[in-house]
């Protein structure tokens, strides 16, 4: 038995405090779930389960994936799982969906991720017991739970500085990489390349009809080498990582619909791709950005492929430094990696990004007739995740 992905959709990505800032993550997830069902004609009651990544769940209520399922109109008898594997959540969800199908535990699974970084709350630790005297400090759950290394108590940006130091990757190289990402994303957006993968989100307005949010708003169409060079280091006084060569803080959702190839034939659905290998691996938390190296090698080994066999790659750009470090280790060229720009330009809604890179990969593979593709991400805390797919 093999597992097929028969549909792949995402929302447009919102900037921090931007167009999607008031839309809770489960609503973003529900929008994508509904789109997958409409696209395929699969009946809501035929979905075996839903698995969605979400990292920032504080204040989101019980089991946000289940909320998305209910909001999307699936039966209450359908189970859902919310997954937190930090930046890898949305792709690990696809792994688990494939495993459920291969094990015979599920027929049809929707998997992906959702995130509203804009709505992540601040918390007041210790407040349950009260404060008898002195000041108390609020903790930003977005920074604490999403962007801070739990083992070294420093920001993900420091791990990027560590990778830059390890591989000798300078500021100019990082900025040049980032400019290319922005230019590619801007060109892709102007050419309408993201149109098929994006499902509009209806954003309520104070007056009048809702507005359809249907275009990635984080892309910097006016990005320039001079502009990037003027930015100060964000994490170390003498560092090389800046706001311009790092990914953003964003909102969005993405999901795919999976089933066995036999089930796809039975329903008359043509697979976008067949899953050929996948992996979740670990590395040193201090250099978490190189996680895709071991994950890619393991996934490719399971598929029986080499890096040279790949026609197209979507590798999440958490930071230019880590993306360049991964490229140096794996030896892949920029001609087949993130051809429409990456997270530095598009943004990085952490719980959704794992599936976002897969959705973008699958649509570009269709467009150019690519046969073999790979989606991969680094994961805060020191892990990597990868998925190898092949068009039938």
Swiss-Prot record:
Bilayer-crossing regions = none
Q: Which GO terms describe its biological process?
A: poly(3-hydroxyalkanoate) biosynthetic process
Q: Pathway it belongs to?
A: Metabolic intermediate biosynthesis; (R)-mevalonate biosynthesis; (R)-mevalonate from acetyl-CoA: step 1/3
Q: Does the keyword Transferase apply?
A: yes
**Is Transferase set as a keyword in this record?**
yes
Q: Where in the cell is it found?
A: Cytoplasm
Give the record's family classification: Belongs to the thiolase-like superfamily. Thiolase family.
**Which NCBIfam families does the UniProt record give?**
AcCoA-C-Actrans
> Which protein, by its recorded name, is this?
Acetyl-CoA acetyltransferase
Classification lineage: Bacteria, Pseudomonadati, Pseudomonadota, Betaproteobacteria, Neisseriales
């Amino acid at each position: 038995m093999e597992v097929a992905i028969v549909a792949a959709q995402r929302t447009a990505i919102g900037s921090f405090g931007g167009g999607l800032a008031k839309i809770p993550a489960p609503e973003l997830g529900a929008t994508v779930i509904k789109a997958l069902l409409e696209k395929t004609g699969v009946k809501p009651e035929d979905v075996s389960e839903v698995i969605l990544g979400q990292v920032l769940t504080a204040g989101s209520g019980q089991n946000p994936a289940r909320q998305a399922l209910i909001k999307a109109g699936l039966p209450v008898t359908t189970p859902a799982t919310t997954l937190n594997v930090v930046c890898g959540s949305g792709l690990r969800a696809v792994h688990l969906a494939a495993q459920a199908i291969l094990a015979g535990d599920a027929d049809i699974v929707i998997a992906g991720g959702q995130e509203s970084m804009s709505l992540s709350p601040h918390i007041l630790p210790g407040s349950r017991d009260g404060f008898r005297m002195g000041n108390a400090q609020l903790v930003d759950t977005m920074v604490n739970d999403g962007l801070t290394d739990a083992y070294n108590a420093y920001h993900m940006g420091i791990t990027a500085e560590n990778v830059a130091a390890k591989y000798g990757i300078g500021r100019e190289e990082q900025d040049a990489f980032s400019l290319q990402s922005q230019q590619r994303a801007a060109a892709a957006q102007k050419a309408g390349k993201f149109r098929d993968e994006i499902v509009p989100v209806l954003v309520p307005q104070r007056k009048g009809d809702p507005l359809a949010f249907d275009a990635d708003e984080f892309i910097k169409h006016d990005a320039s080498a001079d502009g990037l060079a003027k930015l100060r280091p964000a994490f170390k006084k003498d560092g090389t990582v800046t706001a311009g060569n790092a990914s953003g803080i964003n909102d969005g959702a993405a999901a795919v619909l999976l089933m066995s190839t036999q089930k796809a034939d039975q329903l008359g659905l043509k697979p976008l791709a067949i899953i050929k290998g996948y992996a979740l691996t670990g590395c040193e938390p201090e250099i978490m950005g190189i996680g895709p190296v071991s994950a890619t090698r393991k996934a490719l080994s399971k598929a029986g492929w080499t890096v040279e066999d790949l026609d197209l790659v979507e590798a999440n750009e958490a930071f230019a430094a880590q993306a360049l470090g991964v490229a140096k280790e794996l030896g892949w060229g920029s001609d087949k990696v993130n051809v429409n720009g990456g997270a530095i330009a598009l943004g990085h809604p952490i719980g959704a990004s794992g599936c976002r890179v897969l959705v973008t990969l699958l649509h570009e593979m269709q467009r150019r007739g690519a046969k073999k593709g790979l989606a991969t991400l680094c994961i805060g805390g020191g892990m990597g995740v990868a998925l190898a797919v092949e068009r039938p």
